[in-house]
From Swiss-Prot:
Catalytic reaction list: L-seryl-[protein] + ATP = O-phospho-L-seryl-[protein] + ADP + H(+); L-threonyl-[protein] + ATP = O-phospho-L-threonyl-[protein] + ADP + H(+)
Species assigned in the record: Clostridium tetani (strain Massachusetts / E88)
Protein name in UniProt: Anti-sigma F factor
InterPro entries referenced in this protein's UniProt entry, alphabetically: Anti-sigma-factor_SerPK, Anti-sigma_F, HATPase_C_sf
Signal peptide (from-to): none
Amino acid sequence: MFDNMMKLEILSKSENESFARATVAAFASQLDPTLNELTDIKTAVSEAVTNSIIHGYENKGDKTVKIEAYIKDKELTVIIWDEGIGIENVNLAMQPLYTSRPDLERSGMGFTVMQSFMDELEVKSEKNKGTKIIMKKIFNN
């Protein structure tokens, strides 16, 4: 089981990304993270939510991005998913600088950022069914 959990659903609008980031950070603060750890979590959540909005739903603001966070012992698990277009090749998408939308002038560093700021990252996706991102951060304090 888990010690605590939260759930949040937001419309796929870019203005909701900061709310999602702040909400997960507030939830994580019960683990007494350092300022750097909190910044890492906020950045990773921001990247995942932005990916759902821009790539999963192609900026269609009437869809739902779902976020859950769980605390067990000293570990935070954050799950962010959409029911968007999915990722055809997850391994390719996780390569630094890869972007499926070069027309948007994005850097293609979202998954790289998530990997570097969290202790674990798992991406599950199915074409035309959506993407689920599972991230973990372990606290040693």
